[in-house]
Amino acid sequence: MKVIDQFKNKKVLVLGLAKSGESAARLLDKLGAIVTVNDGKPFEDNPAAQCLLEEGIKVITGGHPLELLDEEFALMVKNPGIPYSNPMIEKALAKGIPVLTEVELAYLISEAPIIGITGSNGKTTTTTMIGEVLTAAGQHGLLSGNIGYPASQVAQIASDKDTLVMELSSFQLMGVQEFHPEIAVITNLMPTHIDYHGSFSEYVAAKWNIQNKMTAADFLVLNFNQDLAKDLTSKTEATVVPFSTLEKVDGAYLEDGQLYFRGEVVMAANEIGVPGSHNVENALATIAVAKLRDVDNQTIKETLSAFGGVKHRLQFVDDIKGVKFYNDSKSTNILATQKALSGFDNSKVVLIAGGLDRGNEFDELVPDITGLKKMVILGQSAERVKRAADKAGVAYVEATDIADATRKAYELATQGDVVLLSPANASWDMYANFEVRGDLFIDTVAELKE
């Protein structure tokens, strides 16, 4: 990693632990900062805080005392999930204290070039595809960021022979200043996380931070299926490389079942190892990045053909007596579920849907669920999802939790059918995150097979 001294002897407050906060605290300590960690979880239930204290880092737990900011901190590094409406952050900003996320730290110390991937849907799959293609080509793609490996941790071990492939959320990108990837990808932009950002325009602005420091020597890969992406091309200094499944573009595109890059066939769409039109888009974005990094077509084709998907992203789980189970727990919004359904014959699908109620109706989903064999509906949003099912003329049953839903879906399915967990909702009404929800689905499928 690069040795930098801008944090040496500077007082830094790390707000919120989890993986990213813990990693940031250790990195800042290593860089010579005077670190204070503040986390809401009580000390006795906080193994991360206990470990940091043993390492000599000051920790304050069990709440977020505003008087803590009476100290003269030079910087705050916050957990991405903590909203800017948090009183601690509001006070820090009012005092002129810069508020960053650990992504900024990762950029500052990384010896490796950075490829950043953001968007509303497809981030994790595209990040993983890019990482695997680059690694197959000998460029060693190191996955980091929102994909589960703290960027500031991975950046410490990355050399200039590696490539840091970073999945970036809007939450993370709100806290960057100098962050400068060589290539950035925006998979798509849809109205999500409005409860955090306040409006769609603010959400888009957060995503757009990914390109703030890019120049004409850098590449910004955009989804030209969306007019919004086309409109944004005039607002960046970066060189835009488009991808599209709807039209021929000066980049990566789909035509007559083939995936092209600037007029050259790379592979057939039906050779991609995972189903669904959304994965064609993900593959096109990956092809664009790979070609910009001079990866040969054969390596791209072999890697994407062998690609088995990502856990919780349209993940094939098992086959029980001819019934296939797919875990798409990461589908936390309507678009993601629409994309998932596009890969299947609706008449053979039993869909499990519902979760956190964010107040939105599901009318947009009606055309996509029309013709489903059955639905199993659960969660806070159940009444809203049921209204959409009624409009689509789809019969449904209700479930109390994911295990119950999985069992009921299997009972409704017959040989040749698909049980698809694609909730179109976040998990937080019942579960800590979509991973917990997906793991419970996987565990229940395993029990059904016994």
Swiss-Prot record:
Pathway: Cell wall biogenesis; peptidoglycan biosynthesis. Its EC number is 6.3.2.9. One of its GO terms (cellular component) is cytoplasm. It is found in: Cytoplasm. It is an enzyme of class 6 (ligase). It catalyses: UDP-N-acetyl-alpha-D-muramoyl-L-alanine + D-glutamate + ATP = UDP-N-acetyl-alpha-D-muramoyl-L-alanyl-D-glutamate + ADP + phosphate + H(+). ATP binds at G119, S120, N121, G122, K123, T124, T125. One of its GO terms (molecular function) is ATP binding. Keywords: ATP-binding, Cell cycle, Cell division, Cell shape, Cell wall biogenesis/degradation, Cytoplasm, Ligase, Nucleotide-binding, Peptidoglycan synthesis. It holds the Pfam family Mur_ligase_M. GO terms for biological process: cell division; cell wall organization; peptidoglycan biosynthetic process; regulation of cell shape. Its main location: cytoplasm. InterPro entries: Mur-like_cat_sf, Mur_ligase_C, Mur_ligase_C_dom_sf, Mur_ligase_cen, MurD. Belongs to the MurCDEF family. Cell wall formation. Catalyzes the addition of glutamate to the nucleotide precursor UDP-N-acetylmuramoyl-L-alanine (UMA). HAMAP family: MurD. This is UDP-N-acetylmuramoylalanine--D-glutamate ligase. It comes from Streptococcus pneumoniae (strain ATCC 700669 / Spain 23F-1). The gene is murD.
